[in-house]
């Protein structure tokens, strides 16, 4: 209660209510002969409009986004799902991938400098969202962020990390592997293939499931090609999670500006996704 009082006390824009007015508003008694129905509805509506103020939720969300509170909340939800038997406690595999989240602002109308390979060479910054960056994906230029995600073998999101869209995947694998037990197999696409990442897996006693990437003048061997084909079949769970985020939760585009707020929204969406998977498991008919 002390933290809540301290938080609202500094919010000068929030409405200040006297104790007498608050008491009178909270006496929204059920409709009766002495309290007509329309009067009851009016009192209840005034009560909701005052206490369910968007400013309260906005400041509370921003407060949670300042540190790792939402990451800890995601871990807490996963731990509770494990205790209820809805999630595997120690999965033998971890699947890593990334998806693009477009910025909430309109795209900037300006030219984009690209190199000979079509990659963006100039650092163009949007006029509203200062943290978003451009990236070329499937032949299209997109402005936004990149969500690096780690799921277990069942598709439950365990950890995520948000960067500008132009950040390369291979440099952001170690933060996703924190907390993994030894012996876990890490599956990832060729975007995460690098000597540093393979060494990181070896040092932390994690099994290498990263697809190999062909280099210039050094194509993949037949064995590496077969290995990549096999590993690609094990990564569908994280791609299904991204598909659910985009379709059911409409998260192909962010709702806020800035890296911190987009990261907060991604964590909240991940919690909803995990709870949805658990609810679907509860409603599924028991196998004979």
UniProtKB/Swiss-Prot annotation:
<dbReference type="GO" id="GO:0004803">
    <property type="term" value="F:transposase activity"/>
</dbReference>
<dbReference type="Pfam" id="PF01609">
    <property type="entry name" value="DDE_Tnp_1"/>
</dbReference>
<keyword id="KW-0814">Transposable element</keyword>
<keyword id="KW-0233">DNA recombination</keyword>
<dbReference type="GO" id="GO:0003677">
    <property type="term" value="F:DNA binding"/>
</dbReference>
<comment type="similarity">
    <text>Belongs to the transposase 11 family.</text>
</comment>
<dbReference type="GO" id="GO:0006313">
    <property type="term" value="P:DNA transposition"/>
</dbReference>
<dbReference type="InterPro" id="IPR047959">
    <property type="entry name" value="Transpos_IS5"/>
</dbReference>
<comment type="function">
    <text>Involved in the transposition of the insertion sequence.</text>
</comment>
<dbReference type="InterPro" id="IPR002559">
    <property type="entry name" value="Transposase_11"/>
</dbReference>
<protein>
    <recommendedName>
        <fullName>Transposase for insertion sequence element IS1106</fullName>
    </recommendedName>
</protein>
<keyword id="KW-0815">Transposition</keyword>
<keyword id="KW-0238">DNA-binding</keyword>
